[in-house]
Amino acid sequence: MRDIFERRDGDAAGRIGELSVPRAGTTVETPALLPVVNPHIRTIAPAELESTFGAQILITNGYILYGSDEYRERALADGLHDLFDFSGAIMTDSGSFQLSEYGEISVTNEEILRFQRDIGSDIGTPVDIPTPPEASREQTAADLETTKARLEAAETVDTGEMLVNAPVQGGTYPDLREEAAEHAYGTTLDVFPVGAVVPLMNSYRYGDMIEAILGAKRGLGADAPVHLFGAGHPMMFALAVAAGCDLFDSAAYALYARDDRYLTVAGTDHLDDLEYLPCSCPVCADHTPAELQAEDDTERERLLARHNLHVSFQELRTIKQAIKKGNLLELVERRARGHPAMVDGYRALLEAADQLERDDPVSKGSFFYLSGESARRPEVKRHHDRLSRLSVDGDRVLLSEGGDNSRFDETWRLQPPFGPFPPALSDSYPLTAELPERLDDRAYEAAAKGVRRLVDDHPETEFAVAHWGWPDAALDSLPDGVELLRLGADSDHPERDSAQSDMDGDEPKEDYPPGEDENA
């Protein structure tokens, strides 16, 4: 067991945790953002990152320092913390990005690890091989073997108290990501960055990014802190946190500012396209777009970088509050609606509902049904799985969206998207869900799946479904032999079908509207 990371709260696979960084003598609350600091271009001083934005940890490129005539000796003599005037934790990269960009670097794996140790890095990184998304499986597997060897070599380097990253590669092949993660987790290394995802984000391949993260998570233990290398845009933080990422590093705040780009949780705007600033951070409260445009290049870049950091740190606070309230997936859905590619990422996340369900709390606040995607959430899957553990009472059971009826030995409630459940569970999560009046077809289809699960588990029992006009696709998916009863008109629901007949010829109970037998 690794004792540097502790989970405090969670929702879906997202978590609020504490990462202990012994060399820095500090604990970092996660999810955390590591602003990237280029020693040659300090758009915002590290001291300001700490004092104004609350940054507890930052990242800089150890390879740039290693090759810098200006900074190498200063870093060795004074240490990173004095060099940057930063009291929090400092992570260093090894030059793997330069390797992926230029094909070679002028330092060995062991040399760069020792250099990172000697300059006082708190979390160092070996030289892994970032495989581009377009690489073949054979090339990806070969690169992965090299990365594995370098992680094993990193274990033999005396790094003192410095934590060491164990990058998880594997390209766009989730099984290779899982294999890489299992190997990395089996080492004595400490933090687990999911690497080579920047090209996926740059091309808006958020579905592939999520599959890479989920593959890596399958190979890691619950005590493994996960860093999404190169992820710095706030629009995807909630999605990545829900998939299980704890750390993010952002050069975007400065790089985008240099190009007059303005970050939001819904995407990126060019300053020239803005007539209003849709933000209340100190920069946006004190300036109009025209005033920002009137600044000289250096000051405008600095102001935009500050805004970009404010919105990024604010989003992480929003995510943490969503985790505490148990509505992280609802936040993810709202963020996903900002861009079609984010919808792809959200759908890829929900395809792994089985995986998410293992970490998702059994009880939280209200479940809000926001769209057809909500029908695929892990809470719905958990309810369907729970049906296998419930028993029915009697030979004839009614599953009803209305009330009960004397023809049946027992009546269970029926509620899309969850399906059937005994009345005793009516006040339990997630069956207290807030639902729109006009549900989409996927809610009914998910409920029908729950009915199928219950019917299949009780083959000797006769079941009937009393519904308020379910769509044909949901009804057609029910098992043969299930009696279908159409409920009648309801003054509170004028859009429902008004066909009526008494189900058994007896006077129905007061809370059960009359209906018709669709199987007659």
Curated annotation (Swiss-Prot):
Residues 485-520 are annotated as: Disordered. One of its GO terms (molecular function) is zinc ion binding. The active site is at 93 (nucleophile). Binds 1 zinc ion per subunit. Zn(2+) binds at residues 279, 281, 284. Keywords: Glycosyltransferase, Metal-binding, Transferase, tRNA processing, Zinc. NCBIfam families: arcsn_tRNA_tgt, tgt_general. This is tRNA-guanine(15) transglycosylase. It comes from Natronomonas pharaonis (strain ATCC 35678 / DSM 2160 / CIP 103997 / JCM 8858 / NBRC 14720 / NCIMB 2260 / Gabara).
